[in-house]
A protein has these predicted regions:
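Substrate-gating cap/lid region and adjacent catalytic-acid/histidine neighborhood
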Residues: 3, 26-202
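Solvent-exposed, acidic/flexible segments
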Residues: 13, 139, 204-208
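Mature extracytoplasmic/periplasmic domains
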Residues: 221, 225-250
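A generic structural signal for well-ordered alpha-helical segments enriched in polar/charged residues
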Residues: 22-23, 148, 152, 213, ...
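Stable alpha-helical elements in mature extracytoplasmic
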Residues: 12, 16-19, 29, 142, ...
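Fold-level recognition of mixed alpha/beta catalytic cores in primary-metabolism enzymes, strongest
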Residues: 1-21
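Non-catalytic, well-ordered alpha-helical segments in soluble enzyme domains
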Residues: 204-226
């Protein structure tokens, strides 16, 4: 997931020992850890957690996902992939200081930072620029990389950019749609999901229905003989040399 480094399997033993000391366990083993309820793990923070990327190098995940795509060993199948406009909302959970990343570039790669700024005209301040750069490096870039990988296998790819914010949440989500905000729209369950069901306007479920239809049409129509998904706005698949994108911008 993302373009963040995966967690090397050889480091997991150190994590296991630290977790055993944290709970505490008399014997530091995977078997003893599995006996602990799952709810005890989700709230763990560094250095006890392994997020946001998974462990790699074992039977479950032998190599990093991106390596598989670069080597062309992924399944040959249509893909839908995209990102949200404020994916940087989750960077603090990842342990990333978005303003600090820009400050580091200024110290170590001043010329490179100058080039990066050309890609974001009008964006002022380290935090604002860091939000844009970290979002694109960790999330937006991944969609482009996967698109190219599937095209090399002769498979179509549909990319999206999700920027819809519920009408009652504009003051909360000042920079756009947060990481994961698209899920309730994809599954069209705004009227059932908390807390959005408490304040969803008439326009919000209407938009969610359109989003869900695109996803359903992808499941029904996507294939090597399909170049466009039907919907309120026809959604063409990306073509070699043409990186098409379905936007939703408020």
């Amino acid at each position: 997931v993302y373009t963040l480094p995966f967690f090397p399997g050889e480091k997991r033993l150190g994590k296991l020992r630290r977790r055993a000391e944290h709970f505490p366990l008399a014997v530091a083993s995977a078997e003893r850890l599995r006996e602990i309820p799952a709810d005890a793990f989700w709230a763990l923070t560094a250095p006890l957690n392994i997020g946001p990327a998974p462990i790699v190098g074992d039977a479950v995940l032998p190599e990093p996902m991106l390596d598989t795509f670069f080597k062309g060993r992924q399944h040959a199948m249509p893909v839908m992939i995209g990102s949200n406009s404020d994916e940087a909302s989750v960077m603090a959970v990842f342990g990333v200081d978005i303003a600090g990343q820009i400050q580091k570039l200024r110290r170590e790669r001043r010329f490179g930072l100058g080039l990066i700024k050309l890609l974001y005209p009008g964006v002022k301040g380290d935090e604002a620029l860091g939000r844009e750069v970290c979002r694109d490096m960790a999330f937006t870039t991944l969609g482009y990389v996967v698109m190219q990988a599937q095209q090399r296998l002769g498979q179509p790819c549909w990319r999206y950019w999700f920027d819809y914010v519920a009408e009652a949440e504009h003051e909360t989500y000042l920079h756009g749609a947060w990481h994961g905000n698209e899920v309730v729209y994809v599954f069209d369950n705004l009227t059932r999901a908390e807390p959005v069901c408490q304040y969803a306007s008439k326009a919000d479920p209407a938009f969610a229905a359109q989003v869900a239809d695109y996803w359903a049409n992808f499941a029904r129509q996507a294939g090597t003989q399909c170049s466009e998904l039907t919907g309120p706005v026809p959604w063409p698949a990306c073509q070699p040399g043409r990186a098409r994108l379905l936007p939703r911008v408020l």
